[in-house]
Amino acid sequence: MVKTAQLLQTLNDQLSELAALVAPLAEHATLSPRFDRQLFHTRSTLMQAYLAEAQHNFNQLRQAVERQQLPQVVWIAERLAAQIAALRRETATWSLRSWDHASPTLSRWQRRRLQHQEYERRLLAMRDQRQRQLAQATSLDEQQRLGKEVEAYSGRLARCRQALDKIENVLARLTR
């Protein structure tokens, strides 16, 4: 039972780590579902939905362990491990995926959306990095410089999000 508890804890830790990796991409949509139905039941185009399904499977695994349903435990554990591996691969290769095929006008706007989502992710990462550096800065000059950089990144992020909202509105009109 101790070994099972350790394995559950390891899976829980992996899911927590994965949630942190997926967080910047969680609400970013793709043109089509990312995984086949054998691996994930959800047909969503949002990464958050796939992560939520993996979390749900982890909860089912925990319940199956408590009820000592060995065949279910084995099946759910294998499925969950495959889901975690697939989500890790997807987050690692996200920036390489520029777009999926669709109609020319629609695909151009969807490509723009994906581009802006990537800009947003990178701006968030840069702003967060500068905020961490600012928290650790010791000299006044360094604090002022980093403070200005954080403000600049926040402004860029706000403009990027405004552009994303406009793109989403155009896409909503095109797909009605």
From Swiss-Prot:
Keyword Protease tagged: no
Coiled-coil boundaries: none
Pfam name, any one: PriC
Record-annotated membrane-spanning stretches: none
Domain of life assignment: Bacteria
InterPro entries according to UniProt: PriB/PriC_sf, Primosomal_replicat_PriB/PriC
Keywords: DNA replication, DNA-binding, Primosome
Subunit structure: Component of the replication restart primosome, which is composed of PriA, PriB, PriC, DnaB and DnaT; DnaG primase associates transiently with this complex. Interacts with the C-terminus of SSB; this interaction is required to load the main replicative helicase onto substrate replication forks. Interacts with helicase DnaB alone and in the DnaB-DnaC complex, probably 1:1 binding with DnaB. Interacts with DnaT.
UniProt record similarity statement: Belongs to the PriC family.
Function: Involved in the restart of stalled replication forks, which reloads the DnaB replicative helicase on sites other than the origin of replication. Recognizes abandoned replication forks and remodels DNA single-stranded binding protein (SSB) on ssDNA to uncover a loading site for DnaB. There are several restart pathways, the PriA-PriC pathway is a minor restart pathway. Part of the minor PriC-Rep pathway for restart of stalled replication forks, which has a different substrate specificity than PriA. Part of the major restart pathway with PriA, PriB, DnaB, DnaT and DnaG primase.
Protein name: Replication restart protein PriC
Organism, scientific name: Klebsiella pneumoniae subsp. pneumoniae (strain ATCC 700721 / MGH 78578)
